[in-house]
């Protein structure tokens, strides 16, 4: 039996079973389960729940099926449920077990994403999202009574088995695996229930959950370290939450996967790739002192040209037909103060034009405090303007809840004129999809403002890394690098203090990096396509947040984008949780296709309680797997 001191079980919990379930079923009689070994079972549909059965009791790993399904195994009691991590696909039925007083145990680190207080705080801070350090697949509402107390290496017994929790961060920060082996037989099978630490040889499930920030390998590195640590446990069976059971070469499967993950992590940096792999270090001919590189706008202005200045993220360009100025990417109060100081020191005129290169707050939120900004024209590429004028429309990082009004939204390739300059706007996705470049001639030099694409900052530059949540992919970087190569400006006006002279050879290497990084990312994806697997947005609900009263009708559009090179059948289920109307639809999309489904019958329940309600939009592809973290939020008002 489970050690009472460890699991804190004061009594066994009896399940209401039908009489014909009081005996163990044979393998042929099992409807929902497959027998993997003596007393070891797995559900037939993924994500999988695993069960250890000893006598009348069962110990579950993860909670993807309701309690009544366990009765089929002949167990009269579920002694406890052990969660590998907080994700809602593997913890979906945790609340159902708690309702039957079954202990649900989770890693200590899971509390912020499983317990009601932590989950409510997460959703309050995540919509809209002002940073990139987020979590994925969080339950719409927390579960009361989950014991988030499991610690690494503290073993306990259940029946004939010894169960050891093993910290396995990577897929999520709080991820654990469980090593189960016979307590009295050192030569018996060693089952490693590895959750989503591994899908299969060389493959990760939803690799975008390893994007712990928006550009580095901070999540991929512990993923690889975890895989090697698990290999050292010498398991005889690997039992993942989504992938097939592995019974041969388990340690090698884990280390092979670690190698593939290491390669993807290495390729997150163009700088590292070109220095170490190509042995050809980039040669930047910077146009301003290096003190501006990676600065936050706190350095004195540096002069890039007679009429152009930079500090941090912000450029100021003086008109050729007057004394007014164009401010590109004002960032907060510091930037606004710096612009005023520059205007005073250089005897410049008022702010006449403001534009934003991309939809990250450190490049646009200064508009709200910029002196004269309320009287200036405000331009941007239409793709960049979309999330800024309506911050509740999309799920994206680095947004600000204050909407911005635009006087001009330009399309890709469209030009505008101001102060004697012709400004041509280009869509230039890279660090984020919502990015533009602006092409113009300044003091006789052909210039290209490239936003946070292609700036230099040692190992991690604006060329890499990538983040699925940011709609950022290596293949997209490569395409945009090719666009810059074709435009061949004389000067690349990158941000974060890094304008430099254009080098065609450097951009040819960036194109090559995009191709190589894309292949490394593809290699760890179950589908073989990082544009599909590394993308939490392939199914989206718009708007991401709306406010309504009980009984009100909601607006809603589900957009599905098949970013893979194969046809995809996707079933979308809106799980209304009694707050809004449920809905289900199946869409079939050829490669590259987009479809949208307008939900005109969504209604807030008349008894919906005031507050924020998160509604999960479940997606299942032809394999039956849920790989997309889609949801929307409704703030219900009295």
Where in the sequence are the language-model features?
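Intrinsically disordered, low-complexity Pro/Gly/Ser/Thr-rich segments with frequent PxxP/GP/PP motifs
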Residues: 579-606
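Low-complexity, acidic Ser/Thr/Pro/Gly-rich terminal tails and inter-domain linkers that flank the onset
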Residues: 518-549
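Asparagine-centered strand-capping/turn motif at beta-strand->loop junctions
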Residues: 560-564, 605
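Metallo-beta-lactamase
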Residues: 57-58, 155-158, 162-267, 324-327, ...
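Short acidic, flexible loop segments centered on an aromatic residue
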Residues: 565-579
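Terminal connector regions
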Residues: 606-638
């Amino acid at each position: 039996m489970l050690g009472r001191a460890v699991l804190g079980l004061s009594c066994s919990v009896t399940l209401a079973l039908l009489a014909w379930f009081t005996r163990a079923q044979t393998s042929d009689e099992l409807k929902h389960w497959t027998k993997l070994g003596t007393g070891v079972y797995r559900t037939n549909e993924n994500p999988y729940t695993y069960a250890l059965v000893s006598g009348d009791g069962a110990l579950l790993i993860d909670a993807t099926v309701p309690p009544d399904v366990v009765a089929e195994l002949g167990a009269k009691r579920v002694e406890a449920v052990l969660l590998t991590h907080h994700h809602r696909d593997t913890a979906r039925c945790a609340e159902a077990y708690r309702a039957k007083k079954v202990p649900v145990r989770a890693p200590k680190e899971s509390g912020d994403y499983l317990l009601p207080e932590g989950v409510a705080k997460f959703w309050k801070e995540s919509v809209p999202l002002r940073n990139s350090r987020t979590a994925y697949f969080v339950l719409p509402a927390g579960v009361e009574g989950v014991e988030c107390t499991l610690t690494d290496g503290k073993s306990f017994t259940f029946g004939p088995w010894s169960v050891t929790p093993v910290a396995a961060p990577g897929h999520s920060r709080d991820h654990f695996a469980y090593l189960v082996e016979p307590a009295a037989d050192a030569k018996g099978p060693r089952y490693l229930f590895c959750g989503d630490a591994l899908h299969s040889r060389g493959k990760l499930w939803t690799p975008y959950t390893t994007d712990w920030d928006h550009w580095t390998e901070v999540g991929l590195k512990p993923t690889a370290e975890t895989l090697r640590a698990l290999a050292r446990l010498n398991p005889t069976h690997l039992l993942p939450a989504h992938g097939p059971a592995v019974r041969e070469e388990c340690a090698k499967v884990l280390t092979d996967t670690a190698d593939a993950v290491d390669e993807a992590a290495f390729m997150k940096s163009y700088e590292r790739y070109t220095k170490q792999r190509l042995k050809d270090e980039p040669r930047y001919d910077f146009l301003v002192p290096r003190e501006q590189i990676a600065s936050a706008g706190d350095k004195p202005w540096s002069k890039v040209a007679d009429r152009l200045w930079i500090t941090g993220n912000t450029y100021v360009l003086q008109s050729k037909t007057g004394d007014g100025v164009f401010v590109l990417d004002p960032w907060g109060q510091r930037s606004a103060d710096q612009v005023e100081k520059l205007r005073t020191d250089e005897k410049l005129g008022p702010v006449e034009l403001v534009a934003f290169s991309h939809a990250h707050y450190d490049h646009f939120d200064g508009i709200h405090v910029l002196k004269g900004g309320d009287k200036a024209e405000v331009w941007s590429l239409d793709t960049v303007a979309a999330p800024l004028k309506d911050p509740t429309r999309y799920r994206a990082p680095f947004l600000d809840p204050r909407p911005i009004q635009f006087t001009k939204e330009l399309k890709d390739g469209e030009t505008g004129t101001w102060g004697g300059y012709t400004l041509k706007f280009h869509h230039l996705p890279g660090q984020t999809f919502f990015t533009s470049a602006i092409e113009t001639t300044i003091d006789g030099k052909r210039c290209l403002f490239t936003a946070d694409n292609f700036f230099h900052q040692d190992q991690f530059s604006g060329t890499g890394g990538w983040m699925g949540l940011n709609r950022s992919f290596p293949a997209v970087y490569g395409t945009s690098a090719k666009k810059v190569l074709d435009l061949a400006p004389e000067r690349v006006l990158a941000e974060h203090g890094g304008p430099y002279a254009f080098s065609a050879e450097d951009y040819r290497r960036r194109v090559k990096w995009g191709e190589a990084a894309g292949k490394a990312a593809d290699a760890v994806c179950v589908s073989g396509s990082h544009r599909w697997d590394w993308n939490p947005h392939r199914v989206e609900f718009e708007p991401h947040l709306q406010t309504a009263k009980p009984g009100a009708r909601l607006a809603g559009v589900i957009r599905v984008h098949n970013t893979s090179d194969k046809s995809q059948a996707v079933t979308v289920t809106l799980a209304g949780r009694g707050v809004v109307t449920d809905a289900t639809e199946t869409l079939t999309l050829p490669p590259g296709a987009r479809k949208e489904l307008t939900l005109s019958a969504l209604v807030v329940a008349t008894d919906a309680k005031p507050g924020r309600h998160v509604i999960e939009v479940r997606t299942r592809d032809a394999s039956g797997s849920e790989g997309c973290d889609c949801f929307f939020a409704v703030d219900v008002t009295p």
